[in-house]
From Swiss-Prot:
Listed GO biological process terms: compound eye morphogenesis; cuticle pattern formation; dendrite morphogenesis; genital disc anterior/posterior pattern formation; heart formation; labial disc development; mucosal immune response; negative regulation of hippo signaling
Species this protein is from: Drosophila melanogaster (Fruit fly)
Location in the cell: Nucleus
Post-translational modification: Polyubiquitinated by RDX in the presence of CUL3, which results in proteasomal degradation. Phosphorylated on multiple sites by protein kinase A (PKA) and phosphorylation by PKA primes further phosphorylation by CK1 and GSK3. Phosphorylation is essential for its proteolytic processing. cos recruits multiple kinases to promote efficient phosphorylation of ci while Hh signaling inhibits phosphorylation by restricting the accessibility of ci to the kinases. Phosphorylation by CkIalpha and dco enhances binding to Slmb, the F-box recognition component of the SCF(slmb) E3 ubiquitin-protein ligase required for ci processing.
Disruption phenotype: RNAi-mediated knockdown severely reduces adult survival following the ingestion of E.carotovora. Abolishes Cad99C-dependent formation of endosomes and DUOX-dependent up-regulation of reactive oxygen species (ROS) in the intestines of adults fed bacteria-derived uracil.
Subunit note: Interacts with RDX. Interacts with cos. Interacts with slmb; the interaction is enhanced by phosphorylation by CkIalpha and dco.
UniProt keywords, alphabetically: Activator, Developmental protein, DNA-binding, Metal-binding, Nucleus, Phosphoprotein, Repeat, Repressor, Segmentation polarity protein, Transcription, Transcription regulation, Ubl conjugation, Zinc, Zinc-finger
Protein name (Swiss-Prot/TrEMBL): Transcriptional activator cubitus interruptus
Main localisation: nucleus
Superkingdom of the organism of origin: Eukaryota
Length: 1397
């Protein structure tokens, strides 16, 4: 074996030896001698700042520096004056020193130049090798001196190389060494040679003098003799090593800052070769000149030595830009040797071997050669990750098949491009990287070299690939910056423009074959055209695995997203989302790499290159994207069905799936809604929501074709957009299928890994939703206005309460109402029971089922109607104000009401036992029962009013009413819709049992509400003791049953009719229980406050009058909404009263009664909440104590025929407009929805029907209570005598009616109560309210009938809530519904009033 043959198990040894040899040569050329007679072992110069480093020295034999003929004489010395003492004269020691024992440590060299520890064993093997053909003069020296046994001073070695001395290798180096000046102008490789270092060293200083400089100078004794950057980069752990030469190109040399495009190689740019590059190259290549190399050595060092002259000595002047004078031998194996000079020049003139195959038949089997690096002298193997071409094929293609190619003149100039192919052997397995790169890099072109420009109308031919790249960048790309279009011939992109210039530059590498991004690890020859592909490849060396499996509990990590997707789809899922788009091919794969391989192998490379396999995802069950989606949308959806990407920004490998959640059956089905672990179908109504949606005709505003079904959205999103709550309550079943929100594409984000429900049937949806993007989308949804869709609603005879039917005249506004009817008994949100859930906040909604006391129900409920116009909610859809008080997280019970409640909830009742009382007296499965949908909304209305902000400011206005027991001794808002409750007069006047029972159970605002079990059978026992009846008997008499006490009252106050298939939820309006005493300064003008305070002073007087009012024992009353008119058949008791009483009782009754009247709101004082159902069952003190000018009239009451079940018809709209109706106003001191009790005269269709008509002398409204808004009713008539006119209500009875007992009471009020308020202020307010009422009259709706069933009382008719003070219901007195709008309008009015004063 040759002395320089290294073991094959150490493939990198020889390449490192080359570099070490070059360092040794540089050290020899630059070393200075020490003082005579001194071995200079371990001596330190006073100015030396480095460690004790022993280096060899050159001992000259002559005296002149320009004609030195010297042999290499090794000398052991210190690094005292080698680098910094420029200009010092050194004495040379003339003797040859042998056998000097050096006891220094292996780190005798400076740390920057120490030999790697893992190579010391190899060097020791070389020194002890008996087959050495030369004598190592440093055999007894430290291991740092044995640079792989390459003693350049050996006369035997130099003689065998044809070099008499090292001076012939480079005369200037020896001359400079003798002169002692490293900065000499004769030494072309000094610090001034290329200005790589910051500045020349001082002429007489030491290295310490340069410490204070801004740019650190090297402390090496021989760093100036070769490329300093190459030295710095050399390290086994470095990303760029010296043996790889240039790892960059002129087009992309900046991908790594330490990679120079033209470093070290004299062949890279022969027209501008720099001497320092030549010197460094020669010194580095000297190891290859010393001894012949075996094929293994050639394989290991081929990438650093491109040419190896064997006969003549290589001098500096041999390096010529034109290599035609050189006879360079290509050696790929010991048996294959050809002279390049004998090769026809046409072999190197072809643009690539593909052209050669087209032009010449013998090249059919020629494989494109492995390209060299952009530096031609340093051969490089650019291996594509998807292909492993053998490097010797390049030689065979270029050399063996070259004889038949026509001649060309570019053989010598192209030699530096193709000569490298022959010097590379097959990289065997032992030379492979330790960490094999198994990554299937995406979108990497094959390996070829293009030198001719095929741009349209351009046929320029270039010598090198670099020149072509420069030409394309400068002449084609830079000159046309308006449109970045590839006009390369036969480009499959079809001149589709790029968005940025860099994308076009990257794309052009497909045509030129340029791969500037090369792996910088030792022994790895892979190169890539895209930097991201190189970064992915580098992870195979570094072991970095940033892509972790997203499946819960799986801890596997991967270096690229493709492997992770493969793992997830194969291991945790059965999905195969990557579909081959080839015609007739039905293959599907779990990962994109498998699809790419399939396309390449089955359909061919051309099919793959032309991207014919690409296509939009199939419009099937696994992909609901439309066919007209763009490719960019595919990237947004992370559908990697296309293995190639055109743009660099599309080439990034993203996680293509989130298979942590497998596809389940359609979530929109009601059977899949789990309510606290119980299927909704087990306890709720079992109907298909598609029944309602199948016949809908949606306009353009509801773009459902390209939207995701709301039921398919994750639970978190449904909770946020009011489609349902975080527990997937049954309220989402009916409404969600119609609420096809505009989600698709906007919610296709990533980041949150929902482990329960994803978009089931969409493969690209199996990924996560990002918190930030999700918050942004939710905010957009909140800010969107609603859409009034004109929808045809089919009749639903058997699925709703009372079988509500549709009014054909109100298609536009009955959409949401019908939806609410559709989900009747399953409506209502559980959110009202989760007081502190954070299900509507954007930060804590990831765990929707985890309850938090810190987020109020206002967060989860009150802002729900502000997000989207949800048809399933009895609320107002509007713009969302993120800082509106309606979304206050601290609002407690007043914000508990979820707006998802439909006709089945009776949440207006006071909360007893901390439970929401529900009256779901729904009549299901009964035909011919219908009612007009009551939720008439305007989608642009603002959100609900404030909650906690209203809680403390106006208490002082109510202090004088302490004798009247309110819930919390304050004034609270009144519900905005009512139940038709029938009242019985059998309570004593002074007991106020109703209030006391409720007040005793009032909880503080910070107490959490216990969760309610959704099992209706369990909940029935909580609320109802007498099912199927809901009759409240209230009176002012003293004959109350002794069996009724407070405890029994709490238990028996409300009876709830519930069936097993009904969901029991309680939804409360966010304005509920608003303390009006806390917001007076915010919303009331000063004059209004003065007026109200004066009016309040007469409270005690009025109360006495009201308490003296006798009330008959039999009264009949109906409560209807002022927003709509309806005719209903309801059950009532024999004793019912039209006047608001003070006590409540519950008695079952089977008497039927038919009524029609208008009622907007009762005076309930502090007893009721905003959204809870209000009744006339309120204390008389609360109903009348605050009324200053209430004309209490005794009513003619009557009893209807018990057996009468006939229906009463509604008068036409014209009849109602021409009708004379009298208003009996009972106005509470509530902040929102100040009501009026309007009894409208109804004309009977049938004479046998029980109809009563109310007559009056005046159309008057009585202003009552301490009003919290500045709007005054337009119908208020102030009399000159300071009194309000008396309203006389007289019944009209038929022969079947019992004769009533009339009673009349007139309450007179002094005019001074209202005279304090300026007339202009009142007039402006009046005009404002009138304009609002006029606006609402245009939206007036007709009335449907309410027909009850025998044996099933329906007494809990819901009335719609007044949504805004700017959009009041027609005929109302003072519509103050929405704090958001009220605050805005009244503050502006207050400013105007102050300016007018």
């Amino acid at each position: 074996m040759d002395a320089y043959a290294l073991p094959t198990y150490f493939p990198l040894a020889y390449s490192e030896l080359q570099f070490l040899a070059s360092r040794r040569a540089a050290a020899v050329a630059a070393a200075a001698t020490v003082l005579p007679g001194s071995p200079c072992i371990n001596q330190h110069h006073p100015t030396d700042v480095s460690s004790s480093v022993t280096v060899p020295s050159i001992i000259p034999t002559g005296g002149t520096s320009d004609s030195i003929k010297t042999s290499i004489q090794p000398q052991i010395c210190n690094e005292n004056t080698l680098l910094g003492n420029a200009g010092h004269q050194h004495n040379h020691q003339p003797q040859h020193v042998h056998n000097i024992n050096v006891t220094g440590q292996p780190h005798d060299f400076h740390p920057a130049y120490r030999i790697p520890g893992y190579m010391e064993q190899l060097y020791s093997l070389q020194r002890t090798n008996s087959a050495s053909s030369f004598h190592d003069p440093y055999v007894n020296c430290a291991s740092a001196f044995h640079l792989a046994g390459l003693g350049l001073g050996s006369a035997d070695f130099l003689g065998s190389r044809g070099l008499s001395s090292l001076g012939e290798l480079h005369n200037a180096a020896v001359a400079a060494a003798a002169a002692g000046s490293l900065a000499s102008t004769d030494f072309h490789f000094s610090v001034d040679g290329n200005r790589r270092l910051g500045s020349p060293r001082p002429p007489g200083g030491s290295i310490r003098a340069s410490i204070s400089r801004k740019r650190a100078l090297s402390s090496s004794p021989y760093s100036d003799s070769f490329d300093i950057n190459s030295m710095i980069r050399f390290s086994p752990n470095s990303l760029a090593t010296i043996m790889n030469g240039s790892r960059g190109s002129s087009a992309a040399s900046g991908s790594y800052g330490h990679i120079s495009a033209t470093a070290l190689n004299p062949m890279s740019h022969v027209h501008s070769t720099r001497l320092q590059q030549i010197q460094a190259h020669l010194l580095r290549a000297s190891a290859g000149l010393l001894n012949p190399m075996t094929p293994q050595q050639v394989a290991a060092s081929g990438f650093s030595i491109g040419h190896m002259p064997t006969s003549a000595s290589l001098r500096v002047n041999d390096v010529h830009p034109n290599l035609s004078d050189s006879h360079i031998q290509i050696t790929t194996s010991p048996t294959v040797t050809k002279d390049v000079s004998q090769v026809p020049a046409a072999a190197f003139s072809l643009k690539n071997l593909d052209d050669a195959r087209e032009k010449k038949g013998p090249f059919k089997d020629v494989v494109p050669e492995q390209p060299s690096s952009t530096s031609g002298g340093v051969a490089q193997v650019e291996a594509d990750s998807a292909s492993s071409q053998l490097s010797d094929r390049c030689y065979n293609n270029v050399v063996n098949n070259i004889t038949g190619i026509p001649g060309d003149v570019k053989v010598n100039s192209r030699l530096d491009e193709y000569i490298n192919c022959g010097s590379i052997s097959i990289p065997s397995n032992e030379y492979d990287c330790a960490n094999a790169d198994t990554t299937d890099i995406k979108d990497e072109p094959g390996d070829f070299i293009e030198t001719n420009c095929h741009w349209r109308s351009c046929r320029i031919e270039f010598i090198t690939q670099d020149e072509l790249v420069k030409h394309i960048n400068n002449d084609h790309i830079q000159t046309n910056k308006k449109a970045f279009v590839c006009r390369w011939e036969d480009c499959t992109r079809g001149e589709k423009p790029f968005k940025a210039q860099y994308m076009l530059v990257v794309h052009m590498r497909r045509h030129t074959g340029e791969k500037p991004h090369k792996c910088t690890f030792e022994g790895c020859f892979k190169a890539y055209s895209r930097l991201e592909n190189l970064k992915t490849h580098l992870r195979s060396h570094t072991g970095e695995k940033p892509y972790t499996c997203e499946y819960p509990g799986c801890s596997k990590a991967f270096s690229n997203a493709s492997d992770r997707a493969k793992h997830q789809n194969r291991t945790h899922s059965n999905e195969k989302p990557y579909i081959c788009k080839a015609p007739g091919c039905t293959k599907r794969y779990t990962d994109p790499s498998s699809l790419r391989k399939h396309v390449k192998t089955v359909h061919g490379a051309e099919f793959y290159a032309n991207k014919k396999h690409k296509g939009l995802p199939l419009n099937d069950a696994n992909s609901r994207l439309q066919q007209n989606n763009s490719r960019h949308n595919l990237q947004e959806h992370n559908i990697d069905s296309s293995p190639c990407s055109e743009d660099s920004h599309l080439g990034k490998m993203l996680g293509t799936s989130s298979p942590s959640i497998k596809s389940e059956s359609d979530i929109s089905s009601s059977n899949h809604h789990l309510v606290n672990g119980v299927r909704a179908s087990d306890s709720l109504l079992t109907y298909s929501p598609d029944d309602l949606a199948e016949n809908l005709n949606l306009d353009d505003g509801w773009n459902c074709d390209d939207d995701v079904d709301v039921a398919d959205l994750p639970i978190v999103l449904r909770a946020m957009v009011n489609i349902g709550n975080g527990n997937a309550s049954a309220s989402t079943i009916g409404g969600s299928v119609l609420a096809r929100q505009r989600f698709r594409g906007r919610l296709q984000t990533k980041g949150i890994n929902s482990s329960t429900i994803m978009l089931c049937n969409i493969p690209e949806s199996n990924r996560t939703f990002g918190i930030s993007e999700l918050n942004q989308r939710i905010t957009e949804l909140k800010m969107e206005p609603g859409t009034d869709a004109e929808i045809k609603i089919p009749k639903l005879p058997n699925t709703t309460i009372g079988g509500y039917t549709e009014d054909p005249l109100q298609n536009q506004t009955s959409f949401r109402n019908t939806v609410s009817n559709k989900q009747g008994t399953v409506s209502g949100s559980i959110q009202g029971q989760f007081r502190r859930d954070s299900q509507n906040s954007t930060a804590s909604t990831y765990y929707g089922s985890m309850q938090s006391r810190r987020s109020s129900q206002s967060s989860q409920v009150s802002s729900i109607p502000t997000m989207r116009p949800n048809p399933s909610c009895n609320s107002t859809a509007s713009f969302y104000d993120p800082i509106s008080p309606g979304c206050s997280r601290r609002s407690s019970q007043m914000s508990n009401g979820a707006n998802c409640n439909s006709f089945t909830s009776t949440s207006g009742l006071p909360v007893l036992n901390k439970e929401s009382n529900k009256s779901l007296n729904a009549c299901i499965n009964k035909p011919n029962i219908g009612v007009q949908g009551v939720g008439i909304y305007n989608s642009s209305l603002p959100p609900p009013p404030s909650s906690h902000l209203i809680a403390t400011n106006l208490k002082r206005l109510q202090r004088k009413d302490s004798e009247y027991h309110n819930f919390t001794s304050g004034r609270f808002s009144v519900p905005s819709y009512m139940h038709s409750l029938h009242i019985k007069n059998n309570k004593p006047v002074g007991e106020n049992e109703f209030d006391k029972a409720i007040a005793s159970n009032a909880r503080r605002q910070t107490d959490p509400v216990p969760n309610i079990n959704l099992d209706p059978l369990t909940n029935i026992s909580r609320f109802s003791t007498t099912p199927h009846s809901f009759d409240i008997n209230v009176g002012k008499t003293n004959n109350i049953a002794s069996s009724i006490n407070k405890d029994n009252l709490r238990k028996d106050l409300f009876t709830v009719s519930i069936k097993a298939d009904m969901a029991m939820t309680s939804d409360q309006h966010p304005n509920e229980r608003i303390n009006l005493d806390e917001v007076e300064e915010l919303i009331l003008p000063d004059e209004m406050l003065q007026y109200l305070n004066l009016v309040k002073d007469d409270t005690n007087h009025l109360e006495k009058e009201h308490q003296a009012v006798p009330v008959g024992s039999n009264v009949s009353e109906t409560i209807a909404s002022n927003h709509y008119r309806e005719q209903s058949n309801i059950y009532y008791t024999n004793k019912q009263i039209l006047t608001p009483p003070s006590n409540v009782d519950i008695q079952p009754n089977t008497t039927k009664f038919t009524v029609q009247d208008k009622f907007a709101m009762t005076a309930v004082g502090g007893s009721f909440s905003q959204r809870e159902l209000s009744t006339l069952a309120v204390p008389n003190e609360h109903g009348h104590a605050k009324c200053e000018s209430f004309h209490h009239q005794s009513q003619k009451y009557m009893n209807t025929d018990i057996g009468s079940k006939q229906q009463s018809a509604l008068p036409s709209a014209h009849q109602r407009q021409t009708e004379k109706s009298n208003y009996n106003q009972i106005i509470d001191s509530s902040m929102t929805s100040l009501p009026e009790l309007n009894v409208d005269s109804i004309y009977p269709r049938n004479e046998t029907e029980n109809i009563f008509k109310v007559h009056g002398d005046h159309d008057n409204e009585i202003q009552c209570g301490i009003i919290s808004q500045s709007q005054m009713s337009p119908s208020t008539n102030l009399n000159n005598d300071g009194q309000f006119s008396t309203v006389n209500m007289q019944p009209i009875t038929t022969s079947k009616l019992f004769p009533p007992e009339p009673q009349k009471i007139v309450c007179d009020t002094q005019a001074s109560n209202t005279s304090v308020m300026h007339l202009d202020t009142y007039q402006r307010t009046l005009e404002y309210v009138q304009s609002c009422q006029n606006w609402m009259e245009t939206n007036n709706t007709s009335t449907n009938q309410i027909q009850s069933l025998p044996g099933m009382p329906v007494n809990n008719t819901l009335f719609p809530d007044v949504s805004s003070s700017t959009h009041p219901y027609h005929g109302t007195n003072m519509v103050i519904n929405d704090m958001t709008t009220s605050l805005t309008s009244l503050l502006e009015e207050n400013r105007y009033l102050q300016m007018m004063q």
